[in-house]
Structures are given as structure tokens and as C-alpha cells.
Design a protein with these regions (language model features):
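Bacterial N-terminal signal peptides
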Residues: 13-21
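Short, hydrophobic beta-strand segments
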Residues: 102-118, 144
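Short, compositionally biased P/S/T/A/G/V-rich stretches that sit at domain boundaries
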Residues: 26-54
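Solvent-exposed serine/threonine-rich low-complexity stretches and specific carbohydrate-binding patches
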Residues: 81-104
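Aromatic/hydrophobic beta-strand junction motif of beta-rich domains
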Residues: 58-68
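A post-motif C-terminal structural segment
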Residues: 94-101, 155, 162-217, 270-683
């Protein structure tokens, strides 16, 4: 009897389960909603991830997956705070160019160049309909930041970006260039004379450790980007140039006030930091499209000055040394609304796969005066120049140490000076480029945004080449001094000095206890860890390293007795002898690195400083030191500077700069726009 009842019971349960499964139908899903939000990702209203200025343009996008391969998404609409968004929604399926894992019938719904004027927290909803009539919806949120009515508006914004420059890099440069006497600085760095300093949190949208692309774009878009992305939110396509865009500070101020944009760097101009002020791409390495966008979208950004390295992107592919190629370029479809709306609604250029384009000639045809070296830069009359293009190397410019040694005729290269080996012996210093940029931009009566980057503070910290990043920090500070002098006495210019992130976990561990001659002897002995034990002085043994500064503003030599000693926290394996490296590591961005004389340069961290036989085991994999997640200092000068105190997010910088440029400087009370605070419920 019990056995019979048990069988009936099991049959009854199985039947109920089967009936229940028939009642649960598959449904389409929304896997991404842009702008990004915690409301969409985790069901929490806070923290608010995306923030915008009133009227700042940005794209909306949703990725929608049907519940079966034989079904389609036939419509999608967006609404804001319960009201339908009337702007056209472009639908694109994933038959091609979507990321792995998305079915071919997945659909992207996009609204381009959307904006909201009303400040406050807004709820965004997307509703989609499947071919069988099923519907799906999802919601997220974003904030439009309130700007406070102030007094005088700032005309000019100068952003000085020391790539990878943390507090330790600033301190090291102060010790070398300024010197200490009984614990007091003898000559302060220019950046140390700014009246206001705060600390900046540097995380990107997808990591606590940012790279340079989102590190820069956070400052000039007000939003987090993924690593490797510039001025865009992430999406689900493989196209590097179709991502949802965010309007930059330069674009917003050019559109609303007519301001010009200047970009000055010691890197290749396609690099992350300069591009992160004017270019929209999810791939910081797509150089051909990046430099084309500089020129073709200058009507959006107001680009008037562009200086640095990177000539390889401006030469037709047939010219030796050119890096142009269709694989790093773009051409938007004129019939597919997904990209056609970038052209139609943003006013962006359509692009073209044109590896044989002579971009250098096109810049000149557009009215840019071109300079290829310091000598020609010096001859340019800024009173007669509205637009300036300077390209001083095929890729990254040589670093300050090698440029200074070149000017001093110090032979360190294979065929002469290092700058001779690279083929560009007459490169300007960063301060010389900055001076000319300011003189040209000063002609723009509606004002300007100027970004100046000390790029190889980061690049040489990656290589753990202490003296090279040290002198690049000094070079950067000389540019800071010029920017401060320009703003001094004016009431219309704000200057900020900061970094996108820290690089290499630089630690000032002390000073050498021996003379340079003794250090050389220890290296020749190949004494390994005994080298460290005799040389490294900590605490009072470090003393005060004393560098003699030449009339050009740089140390006469970096190989002094009792030198400063630097360690690295995010280091890869390396050989170390504590002396200045005669040559930099090979730069794989240079077109002729694998040819002599550049091929004779050290190929990596374990290929240099071998004589001393002292190897330091790294804490990170690979062959390079890495960025760190530590906060970085920000110093400010000029009207509105006092908004930059405290510990702030990197995206806050954008809104503080916008405040003084759009609504004017306000008193300390109520000066800083306060983001909307939303109660975050604990996760279940």
C-alpha cells in the first residue's frame, strides 16, 4: 500500500513539474544599457556612475538578445523619466562584427548625440519587442550635474598632465632639481608653488588600475571609460570607432563658446593622452583613424595646435617609416544608421580607408603651419599663425636626458648622440613647445583649452629608467613654469597640474653611501647583492643628494657621488646597477627599432646593467613595470583653483573646470558641484 502511494506521489510531482515548465516561457533579455549604471547592473540606485553637464551630448545604447535563433527584435524605444525619447533609434543586428558569444540575431539599439538640460537624477528605460510579440524592458540612471551661478567666467583652461607622475616622482624631481639644505628645499619646483593641492582617485570603468586612455578622458569628459578607450562607453561590437560617444570638454566648449583646442606632448600624437582629449575610439592603438580624426573632426573640437612625435601616421603608406594602414582606420557606412547617425547627428566625418593619404599635406591645406624641428619652430611668428602642427619624430620623441645630452654634444649612442641614432637631432624641449602653443592660442579671442603632456615620465617609469623619468619630470616642470607665468596676473586662466595615474610604484628608498667611482668599481666586480648592501643608504645614511644644475636647468650629470636611489613597487624582473643607463631601452613604437643603430640598444630590462650581476625579482609578470591604483596629486593655480582641494574622483575634475568656464568662479561655499546622493540598499 505504501509502495503504491509512493509511486502515485512521484507521478503527481513529476506532472506538476512538467506543467510548471510549460508555463515558464523563454524571454528576450537586455544584456547592456548605456550609459552604464549600477541601477541596471545590480539593481541599486547608487552610486551614480554616469554624469553629464546640462546639454552635454552622449549616446544611448542597449544590447538585446532574442530568446531563440528564429526570432528577431523588431523594435526598441528609449524613454527618460517616463517620457518617450523622440530622437531616431538605430537598430543593428549582430550578423557581423559583434563580440564572441552574441548570437547573430542580437540587436543593438542606439540613439546618437542625446542630451538633457534639466539637472538632477534621471531614469533611462529601454523597451524592446520581439517578433513573437514578447516585450522586455530595463532601466538605468544617470545624473545631470547642477552648475552654480558664479562670477567671472574663465576664458582659458590649461591642463598639464604628467603621465604616470605620482607623489614620489614629484618628490624625486624636487630633490634633484631643487636640492635640500638641512631638510629645507632650496629651490622649489614650479608645481610646488601652486596654492592648492588635492588628491585624485584614478580608477577606470573596469579596473582599479587605469591605463592612460580613461585616465585622461575622465578629466575631460566627466565619465569613466574602459581601459584602452578614449571618449566612449563600452559596447558589444568589434568596431573600434562605433562605440557610444561622450562629448569632450573641448567639443562642448567649442560648440557653445567657440574655444580652440591645443594638444602638446612628448609622445607620439596618436598616443592615449593627447587622443583622449579629441578622439573617440575603443582602441587606443588604432593610430591611422586616430590621427585622421584629429583633422577631419577639427570642426567639433576646435583643434588649432597639435605638437609632439608621430610623423609616421601622417606619411602615405608607401613612404619608408609610415605606419598608416587600413586595419587601424575606419569608414562609417552611409546607409547603416548605426554608424551613419554618428555623421548625421554628431556632425563627425565619415572617415575613409585611405592608407595612402598624405595627412601632412592635408593639415597644411587646412591652414596649419607645419614645423619639423626646433629650428623651424623658433622661426614661427605666432602673431601670424592661427594653426600649428609640429611633428618632431617618427614616433615618441626622445626623452629630456637624451635631448639635453644631444645639445651638450655628449656621445652616448652608437653613431654619435642618442638623438642622432634616432635620426632627429634637433627636437624641441617640452617647455619650448608649450611657449609656442600658448603664443598661438593666445590669438583666439574666445579662449582655449590647452593640454600639455609630459609623456615619458610614464614611459621611462615602465622601463624603470630612473634618471630618464627624473629629467622628464624636470622638463615637465619647466613647462609648468611657463603656463603659470602665462596665467600670472590674469583673471581669466586656470592651470591644473596632475597625472592620469601613477606608474611603477616609485619609492624613494634613500641615497647612495658611496662615491660614483666606488659604485663603478662594485659594478665591475659583479658583486650581486653585495652591491646593494654596500651602496644603499637608508634613513640618516641617505643624507641629502647634491646635484649641480647647469644653466639649461638640468643636472650637469646624474652620476654623482651619494646619488638618490629609487625602488619600484610594481616592478618586473630587472638588472640594476644604480647608475645612469647610457642608452634607453628599444622603443617598439619606432619604425626602425629592428635596424641598426637602434637594434643595438638594450632590448629589455634583463639585457642592460648585467655587469653588476644584481637582479631584482619583480612583483608583476611581464617585462615592464606597471601602473598602480594609488591616488595622484593635483595642483591648481588661478581663479577657481580652490575647488580642487580634498580627495576627489578623476571625473570630478571635469565638472570643476566646466563650472568656472560655463557659470563662472563662485565663492568657497557652494563652490563644488555636489553629485546627487542616492540611498544605496544593501544587496540581498
Amino acid at each position: 500500500m505504501n509502495q503504491h502511494f509512493s509511486k502515485i506521489h512521484r507521478f503527481f510531482l513529476i506532472t506538476l513539474a512538467c506543467l510548471a515548465s510549460l508555463c515558464v516561457q523563454a524571454a528576450p533579455t537586455i544584456t547592456r544599457l548605456t550609459p552604464p549604471s549600477e541601477l541596471f547592473s545590480n539593481g541599486q540606485a547608487a552610486p551614480v556612475i554616469a554624469r553629464f553637464l546640462p546639454g552635454q551630448r552622449f549616446d544611448l545604447q542597449a544590447t538585446i538578445r532574442p530568446d531563440a535563433a528564429d526570432k528577431q527584435i523588431i523594435s526598441a524605444t528609449f524613454s527618460l523619466d517616463g517620457k518617450d525619447i523622440l530622437a531616431p533609434t538605430a537598430l543593428k543586428n549582430c550578423e557581423a562584427l559583434c563580440i564572441k558569444g552574441l548570437p547573430a540575431n542580437a540587436m543593438l539599439a542606439t540613439v546618437r548625440a542625446f542630451s538633457v538640460d534639466a539637472p538632477g537624477l534621471h531614469t533611462l528605460r529601454v523597451n524592446a519587442t520581439q517578433s513573437d510579440g514578447q516585450t522586455v524592458s530595463a532601466q538605468g540612471n544617470f545624473e545631470v550635474v547642477t552648475l552654480v551661478k558664479g562670477g567671472q567666467k574663465i576664458k582659458n583652461i590649461i591642463i598639464l598632465l604628467g603621465d604616470g607622475m605620482g607623489a614620489a616622482q614629484r618628490t624625486a624631481a624636487r630633490i634633484v632639481a631643487g636640492g635640500y639644505a638641512q631638510g629645507k628645499v632650496i629651490a622649489p619646483m614650479a608645481m610646488d608653488t601652486f596654492p592648492v593641492t588635492g588628491m585624485v582617485k584614478t580608477a577606470s570603468l573596469n579596473s582599479i588600475v587605469t591605463d592612460s586612455s580613461p585616465g585622461m578622458t575622465a578629466y575631460v569628459s566627466g565619465n569613466k571609460n574602459n581601459n584602452n578607450s578614449e571618449g566612449v562607453f563600452p559596447d558589444d561590437t568589434l568596431d573600434s570607432f562605433d562605440n557610444p560617444r561622450i562629448e569632450y570638454l573641448s567639443e562642448y566648449l567649442h560648440r557653445t563658446q567657440g574655444k580652440a583646442l591645443g594638444l602638446v606632448t612628448t609622445a607620439d600624437v596618436f598616443d592615449a593622452t593627447p587622443a583622449g582629449n579629441a578622439v573617440h575610439t575603443s582602441n587606443r592603438g588604432a593610430g591611422t583613424g586616430i590621427v585622421d580624426q584629429y583633422l577631419d573632426d577639427r570642426g567639433l573640437t576646435g583643434l588649432s595646435v597639435l605638437m609632439g612625435g608621430g610623423r609616421k601616421w601622417f606619411l602615405p603608406a608607401s613612404v619608408p617609416g609610415s605606419a598608416r594602414g587600413d586595419r587601424t582606420d575606419y569608414a562609417f557606412s552611409s546607409t547603416d544608421a548605426h554608424t551613419a547617425d554618428i555623421v548625421k547627428r554628431w556632425g563627425a566625418a565619415q572617415g575613409n580607408l585611405d592608407k595612402d593619404r598624405n595627412l601632412l599635406a592635408d593639415f597644411q591645406a587646412a591652414g596649419f603651419t607645419y614645423t619639423a624641428d626646433k629650428s623651424s619652430l623658433d622661426t614661427i611668428d605666432p602673431t601670424k599663425t592661427d594653426r600649428l602642427l609640429g611633428l618632431f619624430a617618427l614616433s615618441n620623441m626622445n626623452v629630456a636626458l637624451d635631448k639635453i645630452d644631444g645639445r651638450r654634444a655628449r656621445v652616448l649612442g652608437q653613431s654619435g648622440r642618442v638623438v642622432d641614432d634616432y635620426g632627429f637631432p634637433d627636437q624641441p624641449m617640452l617647455d619650448e613647445m608649450t611657449a609656442k602653443a600658448l603664443a598661438v592660442l593666445d590669438r583666439h579671442k574666445k579662449g582655449f583649452v590647452l593640454m600639455v603632456e609630459g609623456a615619458s615620465i610614464d614611459k621611462q617609469a615602465h622601463a624603470m629608467d630612473t634618471e630618464r623619468w627624473l629629467l622628464d619630470t624636470i622638463e615637465f616642470d619647466r613647462a609648468i613654469a611657463l603656463a603659470k607665468a602665462y596665467a600670472q596676473g590674469r583673471s581669466d586662466t586656470i592651470v591644473i597640474v596632475t597625472a592620469d595615474h601613477e606608474c611603477a610604484g616609485v619609492a624613494l628608498i634613500g641615497g647612495s653611501r658611496v662615491s660614483d667611482s666606488r659604485l663603478q668599481a662594485l659594478v665591475r666586480e659583479g658583486s650581486g647583492t653585495a652591491l646593494r648592501n654596500e651602496v644603499v643608504g637608508v634613513y640618516e645614511q641617505a643624507g641629502f643628494p647634491k646635484y649641480k644644475i647647469d644653466t639649461d636647468g638640468y643636472p650637469q650629470t646624474t652620476d654623482i657621488d651619494n646619488r638618490i636611489l629609487v625602488g619600484y613597487g610594481s616592478n618586473a624582473d630587472r638588472m640594476e646597477d644604480f647608475r645612469t643607463n647610457l642608452q634607453p631601452l628599444q622603443d617598439n613604437q619606432q619604425p626602425f627599432t629592428k635596424q641598426e643603430p637602434l637594434s643595438t640598444y638594450p632590448s629589455g630590462l634583463l639585457a642592460r646593467d648585467q655587469e653588476g650581476k644584481y637582479m631584482i625579482t619583480g612583483q608583476v609578470p611581464g617585462d615592464s613595470a606597471t601602473h598602480t591604483a594609488t591616488d595622484v596629486p593635483l595642483s591648481a593655480f588661478g581663479p577657481g583653483a580652490y575647488a580642487f582641494t580634498g580627495v576627489i574622483d578623476n571625473t570630478d575634475v571635469f565638472f570643476k573646470l566646466a563650472q568656472v568656464a560655463i557659470r563662472g568662479v563662485v565663492p568657497l561655499e557652494g563652490m563644488i558641484p555636489v553629485p546627487v546622493r542616492v540611498q544605496r540598499k544593501p544587496l540581498p
